[in-house]
Swiss-Prot record:
Family statement: Belongs to the neurexin family.
Positions in the Extracellular compartment: 28-1262
Pfam families, per the entry: F5_F8_type_C, Laminin_G_2
All residue ranges annotated as the Laminin G-like domain in the record: 187-368, 373-552, 799-963, 1023-1214
Gene (UniProt): Cntnap2
Topology, Cytoplasmic side: 1284-1332
Protein name (record): Contactin-associated protein-like 2
Topology of this chain in the membrane: Single-pass type I membrane protein
Record's signal peptide: 1-27
Length: 1332
């Protein structure tokens, strides 16, 4: 519907944008002309003025650079911080540089100064750089010239130089030059009533591109700068709201559909300072650049449309009243604009030449009207003393203030005749008045009003007090004014102190006063008289300290916002703070992700399969996402879910009317792209069940079905096939139902067929859309399912390069980290020093190096001088182990951390350079003749981007990609005797010689034994010939154990649980009379029996202190070396035992190992024979005899499986024992705990273990639910058995307990359900099919 409306305007004018530089004033200097002319040297003496002069020979007119007239320059009468030199250029100039020189041949020069500028000689603005009021370094002698090129040019008629420091052995002395060029622009003054319209020639304007530029200045916080709208709902509005710039744009919405095009972006702050601000709007379709005072914001509009359709006109300065909602409740702009350009049209020039046609321009004029207000700027040690009228019965004061601080002293004044004093404070962002009255019973009167008054906006305070009455009004809100009728006597004093109190700094008796005010004040009225601040500046009358009159230099330190990733910025006068709660990031500027970058990283922290938050680009812009990490294999699977994993039925669609199935993932496409890019392999399962529904229409037809992947590209192949081949899996394998076709479904059979398989070309994944178009015929039907995206491996985590010699290095493009930079990597080396990386600028640099065997250094310079942070380790770092280095630098601080050593932090100066400007290439491994790095570096990430060390090493001579020796650092992760195996990308754990399984050999392998079941493992002991000895010299230890016929030692450990005693747990027989047995006696006590010969009776170890047949899992660990036996049971301390001295020390010729029951020919010990029937019932796990794991050999296909014989069917179980893993963190300190940030991402049901659709939508929690229900049902059944036995305990008695409603019920179950509604729920639950 909307598209049809838009089609009617296809004949509208298509605008060609001339160039982007038209956005500047048409008379501004060309970008090809250097703006660097001296502006002071040709000026007459009358163009100079100053705060004072030592004499006429030191007049300001002599302050010209390299001139020797008069006394050789300007010097004031006093050398203090209230002196200044001012120059009037006669008209506005564009200023690009400033230079200073001391007074000729003297000891008078300025070492530091500020530059203020203005259009009118009033309302001065200090030059800003790097977010601070800039202090320029001055001279070191009287003759040399020090020049500074401005970081950004300024436009002004007046320049004022304010010395901050000077030569301590002399006085202030100054000669100066300012460089720039002429500037002129058309200016229009708006009075707040009239608007400036630009009407379109054809009454309509349809644009794909727009470039709109203007400059404005105002003292109002609200006002519309420009507005245009169309009848289709399109509009564009640029306005001020609370002194911030707001751009609102709508390229089209659909009131009957989901398209909502409204977009609003806010920029800037404190724009009501009556200084010029430049705005540039560049639009290309939905892509917008909004630039305010050199700070650019890029964004995309909402909706789906690209053209802006405006009708009739676009207006500047306000919205003409039309009765529409857009024209009401919006103030017109009051202030000045210049250089208004709309798509190449100079609006201000047309207005000046009266070429805009009839309009309601109102009282527009072409010169800027300046405000009458005079601001005062206070710092932490300021005060302003204003005289008042003495002994008045009415105390009346009003003023406006703006600040960021929540507290500060606004006003203090003594009453006459010792009646007390009045104090007005800002306390916790409220204005409070405290009256101390010494002549009344109520000595203290406190009232307060307002809230949130430290927001940087102008706020008005009016306070009036007279006898027995006082009223406080904030921002003119009379309805909220606070009044008091407390007893009060008033007689005004002769002095009013604003912003601070003179005695507050010199007299401890006033220590209860609030800290001095930091901010600006204006429109100060005392006793109903407006204070003339220019007279106060000349100290006639009044006085001040450390204030600047006619300037408000308040800075919004949250604009631009240095808090990243949605962190909330708050500020005081001289600093800002970032609140990172619920962002997923931490640090001073919310720069660092609290999550690991991949599932691979979680695996190496000892975590197990579960849902985790990952952040693939770390500190980058993508943000965290929640995925399932499957860690049951050597390589970790990362699984991303979507909302279409249940089978979807599609009917009634044809090639002209397709069924479009959109998949919504639990992550954005950019986040998923980051996962697939770093993965080694990705796959996604697709399945198409069909009945008379063709799929790809092979071999020669146009596909009826296709899928859309990354970058919205269509793909015409199906699961199991490859890109560019219009086939299904059966077409590749040549086993389709009908060999004439390449897909089973293309045969168009009436019977159900299926085409399914994995899509594995990761550059095309994920599947975002599936289109089906052949289900509209009679009997046609298709069932579609798409599994989750599964990716394996992490190329970034193991991305490494070996540095073969100290003179070698890899180079990359310049590191971009002007205001925020983070660097992290792993290294290992054997040398004590070397440069990890370095990047240089003209004077700036950044470097990380190993300074010594125990020191890592992070050094940089952003223009304030070199800074170095060093972390010292108590142990050597050149130990050929992996060590992690993390360095960060932002506008607030810099930090360095090595491994888990304490982080070292260095705060940034509150004023100074903040941007790191680098130009050279980034060198990794050393450069510039320095001591290079020798060793290995991996996983090098800079601002969230992993540098591909491997690829760069492959194309650089003398380098080797990858690193070896991972097991030296990570071998300890292989638990329970697992062996660490080196791999090109990382390592793996070989669990073949252990009784455990899993990635880190920490997963129990066990089985449940039913009564009568048994397992036998037969030992082999072939003779070892002399010839075999040499060939088997390198055989593993477990093979040697197998070959050894006699054993001088055994290591046995296992876990078991049972409720039945007696039983045999483990028995080892021999070809002689030797045996070993572990059994549970009838009392439940554990007994170990050893018979090695030499004794009449077997040696017994009885553990009598507890019942082991209690159904709980128990761990048994037995170690024998000759005659010494060590037994460790559960968590109890190990206990030592000794075989009799007559006993042999060898276990001769071991034959078989039995679990559960002994089935052995020949003579068996009587105790064993007595306890051998009926056999063990329960669970056994972790069974290991030396290097033999019999249960694992039975349940897994290993080399030892041929030695195993089983009676009965083993059911695998871990016997309720928890996997042996690293100790888990608490939920309070675990950053990837599931409860954290659950609202940030959607969860969709799927089975992560299988990686394909769950048909009935049952997720992994069903196992837990099913287990709980099973326990509940078991409890209910036990209770019913008890009740039945109780009810039938009387013999010869007959009771009937028929359920009500049995007559009408069809069955007994129905009768029970009719009678007991709660039972219905139980039956329903039991009938559910749970996936466990």
């Amino acid at each position: 519907m909307v598209m049809s409306l838009r089609a009617g305007y296809r004949a509208a004018l298509s605008l060609w944008i001339l160039s982007s530089f038209i956005c500047r004033a048409w008379t501004a200097p060309s970008t090809f002309q250097k703006c660097d002319e001296p502006l002071i040297s040709g000026l007459p003496h009358v163009s100079f003025s100053s705060s004072s002069s030592l004499s006429s020979s030191y007049a300001p007119g002599y302050a010209k650079i390299n001139k020797r007239g008069g006394a050789g320059g300007w010097s004031p009468s006093d050398s203090d911080h209230y002196q200044w030199l001012q120059v009037d250029f006669g008209n506005r100039k564009q200023i690009s540089a400033i230079a200073t020189q001391g007074r000729y041949s003297s000891s008078d020069w300025v070492t530091q100064y500020r530059m203020l500028y203005s259009d009118t000689g009033r309302n001065w603005k200090p030059y800003h750089q790097d977010g601070n009021i800039w202090a320029f370094p001055g001279n070191i002698n009287s003759d040399s010239v020090v020049r500074h090129d401005l970081q950004h040019a300024v436009v002004a008629r007046y320049v004022r130089i304010v010395p901050l420091d000077w030569n301590g052995e002399g006085h202030i002395g100054l000669r100066a030059e300012v460089y720039g060029c002429a500037y002129w622009a058309d200016v229009i003054n708006f009075d707040g009533h009239g608007v400036l319209p630009y009407r379109f020639r054809n009454k309509k304007m349809k644009t794909l591109k727009d470039v709109i530029a203007l400059k404005f200045k105002t003292s109002e916080s609200e006002g519309v700068l420009l507005h245009g709208e169309g009848q289709q709902g399109d509009y564009i509005t640029l306005e001020l709201k609370k002194a911030k710039l707001v751009l609102s744009l709508n390229l089209g919405s659909n009131q009957l559909g989901p398209i909502y095009g409204h977009t609003s972006v806010t920029s800037g702050s404190l724009l009501d300072d009556h200084h010029w601000h430049s705005v540039l709007i560049e639009r290309q379709g939905r892509s917008i650049n909004l630039t305010l005072d050199r700070s650019m914001q890029h964004f995309r509009t909402n909706g789906e449309f690209d053209y802006l359709d405006l009708d009739y006109e676009i207006t500047f300065g306000g919205i003409p009243f039309s009765g529409k909602p857009s024209s009401s409740n919006r103030k017109n702009f009051k202030g000045c604009m210049e250089s208004i350009n709309y798509n190449g049209v100079n609006i201000t020039d047309l207005a000046r030449r009266k070429k805009l046609g009839p309009s309601n321009m109102g009282n527009l004029s072409f010169s800027c009207v300046e405000p009458y207000t005079v601001p005062v700027f206070f710092n932490a040690t300021s005060y302003l003393e204003v005289p008042g009228r003495l002994n008045q019965d009415l105390f009346s004061v009003s003023f406006q203030f703006r600040t960021w601080n929540p507290s500060g002293l606004l006003l203090f004044s003594h009453f006459a005749d010792n009646l007390g004093n009045v104090e007005i404070d800002l306390v916790e962002s409220k204005v409070g008045v405290h009256i101390n009255n010494t002549q009344t019973k109520t000595s203290q009167i406190d009232i307060s009003s307002g809230s949130g008054l430290n927001d940087g906006q102008w706020h008005e305070v009016r306070f009036l007090a007279k006898e027995n009455f006082a009223v406080l009004t904030i921002d003119g809100d009379e309805a909220s004014a606070v009044r008091t009728n407390s007893p009060l006597q008033v007689k005004t004093g002769e002095k009013y102190f604003f912003g601070g109190f003179l005695n507050h700094m010199n007299n401890a008796s006033y220590s209860a006063l609030q800290p001095s005010f930091q901010g600006c004040m204006q429109l100060i009225q005392v006793d109903d008289q407006l204070v003339n601040l220019y007279e106060v500046a000349q100290r006639k009358p009044g006085s001040f300290a450390n204030v600047t009159i006619d300037m408000c230099a308040i800075i919004d330190r949250c604009v631009p916002n240095h808090c990243e990733h949605g962190g909330k910025c708050s500020q005081t006068w001289d600093s800002f703070k970032c609140t990172c709660d619920e962002t997923g990031y931490s640090g001073a500027t919310c720069h660092n992700s609290i999550y690991e970058p991949s599932c691979e990283a979680y695996k190496h922290l000892g975590q197990t399969s579960n849902y985790y938050w990952i952040d693939p680009d770390g500190s980058g812009p993508l943000g965290p996402l929640k995925v399932y990490c499957n860690m049951t294999e050597d390589k970790v699977w990362t699984i991303v879910s979507h909302d279409l994993q249940m089978q979807t039925t599609v009917v009634g669609y044809n090639p002209e009317k397709y069924s479009v199935t959109q998949l919504i993932y639990s992550a954005s496409m950019d986040q998923i792209s980051a996962i697939t890019s770093s993965a080694e392999y990705c796959e996604q399962y697709v399945s198409y069940f069909c009945r008379m529904s063709r799929l790809l229409n092979t071999p020669d037809g146009s596909p009826y079905t296709w899928w859309v992947g990354k970058a919205n590209e269509k793909h015409y192949y199906w699961g199991g096939s490859e890109p560019g081949i219009q086939k299904c899996a059966c077409g590749i394998e040549r086993n389709c139902t009908d060999p004439k076709y390449y897909c089973n479904c293309d045969a168009d059979y009436k019977q159900w067929r299926k085409d399914a398989g994995f899509l594995s070309y990761k550059d095309h994944l994920p599947v975002s859309q599936v289109v089906v178009g052949d289900t509209d015929r009679q009997g046609s039907e298709a069932k579609l399912s798409v599994g989750p995206l599964r990716c394996q491996g992490d190329r970034n985590y193991w991305n490494a390069a070996s540095f073969p010699n100290p003179s070698s290095y890899l180079h990359f493009s310049t590191f971009q980290g002007e205001t925020s930079a983070d660097i992290s990597f792993y290294f290992k080396t054997l040398i004590p020093r070397g440069v990890f990386l370095e990047n240089l600028g003209n004077t700036d640099f950044i470097k990380l190096e190993l300074k010594s065997a125990t020191e890592v250094s992070f050094s940089f310079d952003v223009g304030n001088g070199p800074v170095e942070i060093v972390v010292r380790s108590p142990s050597p770092l050149n130990d050929d182990q992996w060590h992690r280095v993390t360095a960060e630098r932002n506008v607030k601080q810099a930090s360095l951390q090595v491994d888990r050593l304490p982080q070292q932090i260095r705060k940034a100066p509150t004023e100074g350079h903040t941007r790191l400007e680098l130009y050279s290439q980034l060198f990794v491994g050393g450069a510039g003749g320095q001591q290079g790095f020798l060793g290995c570096i991996r996983s090098l990430r800079m601002n969230g981007v992993t540098l591909d060390l491997e690829e760069r090493a492959k194309v650089t001579s003398g380098f080797k990609s990858g690193c070896s020796g991972h097991c030296t650092s990570y071998g300890a992760n292989c638990e329970n005797g697992g062996k660490c195996i080196e791999k090109y990308h990382g390592y793996s754990c070989d669990c073949s010689n252990t009784a455990y399984d899993g990635t880190f050999c920490n997963k129990d392998v066990g089985a449940f034994f039913e009564e009568g079941m048994w397992l036998r493992y037969n030992f082999q002991a072939p003779a070892v010939t002399a010839r075999d000895t040499g060939s088997r010299a390198e055989n593993s230890a477990d093979q040697q154990q197998h070959l050894a016929p006699d054993l001088a030692q055994e290591q046995i450990h296992f876990s078991f649980s049972t409720t039945k005693a007696p039983c045999i747990l483990l028995y080892v027989s021999s070809l002689t009379t030797d045996f070993l047995a572990v059994l549970v006696k009838p009392t439940g006590n554990l007994q170990i029996r050893y018979n090695l010969g030499g004794t009449r009776e077997p040696f017994n170890i009885d553990v009598d202190h507890r019942n082991m047949a209690n159904g709980q899992p128990h761990s048994v660990n037995i170690t024998r070396h000759e005659r010494t036996i060590i037994l460790k049971l559960d968590h109890y301390p190990a206990v030592g035992y000794h075989l009799p001295s007559s006993s042999d020390t060898l276990f001769n010729s071991p034959k078989s190992l039995f679990l559960g029951k002994v089935i052995e020919t020949g003579k068996i010990d009587q105790e064993i024979h007595k306890y051998n029937t009926p056999g063990f019932t329960g669970c056994l796990s972790r069974v290991q005899f030396n290097h033999i794991a019999p249960l694992k050999a039975a349940l897994r296909q290993t080399n030892a499986s041929a030695h195993v014989h089983i009676q009965g069917e083993l059911v695998e179980s871990n016997c309720g024992a928890s996997p042996l893993t690293l100790s888990p963190m608490s939920s309070a300190t675990d950053p990837w705990h599931l409860d954290h940030l659950d609202s940030a991402s959607a969860d969709f049901p799927y089975n992560p273990g299988q990686g394909q659709a769950i048909r009935n939508g049952v997720n992994r929690n069903s196992a837990i639910i099913g287990g709980v229900i099973a326990v509940v049902i078991f409890t209910i059944l036990c209770t019913l058995v008890f009740l039945i036995r109780y009810m039938f305990r009387h013999k010869g008695t007959y009771h009937t307990n028929e359920a009500k409603g049995a007559e009408s019920a069809e069955s007994a179950d129905a009768a029970i359900m009719n009678n007991d509604p709660n039972f219905t729920e139980t039956i329903d639950e039991s009938k559910k099919e749970w996936l466990i």
